[in-house]
From Swiss-Prot:
Belongs to the bacterial ribosomal protein bL21 family. It comes from Carboxydothermus hydrogenoformans (strain ATCC BAA-161 / DSM 6008 / Z-2901). This is Large ribosomal subunit protein bL21. One of its GO terms (biological process) is translation. GO terms for molecular function: rRNA binding; structural constituent of ribosome. GO terms for cellular component: cytoplasm; ribonucleoprotein complex; ribosome. HAMAP family: Ribosomal_bL21. PANTHER family: 50S RIBOSOMAL PROTEIN L21, LARGE RIBOSOMAL SUBUNIT PROTEIN BL21M. Part of the 50S ribosomal subunit. Contacts protein L20.
């Protein structure tokens, strides 16, 4: 059994026990987060597709930790004008484990 969920503007294919990295969630590590935005559920070969979401379906995620991704360097440069700008960005994420899929 697996489900396709939407969180943080992205879609993820998840099964029970999966560990995934999602966009940062406002939840403490160790807490349970319920995702109601379930786009599809596949169980024993039968597919339930939502329009846009499957009614009554939800996925429980356990928050493991928060962190930051690897650093991305952005460098702007204009030749002959002595214009240089360098800055970095680290995208925050939340690591979660899929506890239960209810459909």
């Amino acid at each position: 059994m697996y489900a396709i969920i939407q969180t943080g503007g992205k879609q993820y294919k998840v099964a029970e026990g999966d560990k995934i990295f999602v966009e940062k969630l406002n939840a403490e590590p160790g807490s349970i987060v319920t995702i109601n935005e379930v786009l599809a559920v596949v169980k024993d070969g039968s597919i339930k597709a939502g329009n846009p979401y499957v009614e009554g379906a939800k996925v429980n995620l356990k928050v493991v930790r928060h962190g930051k991704g690897r650093k991305i360097i952005v460098f702007k440069y204009k030749p002959k004008k002595n214009y240089r700008r360098k800055y970095g960005h680290r995208q925050p994420f939340t690591e979660v484990i899929v506890e239960k899929i209810e459909a």
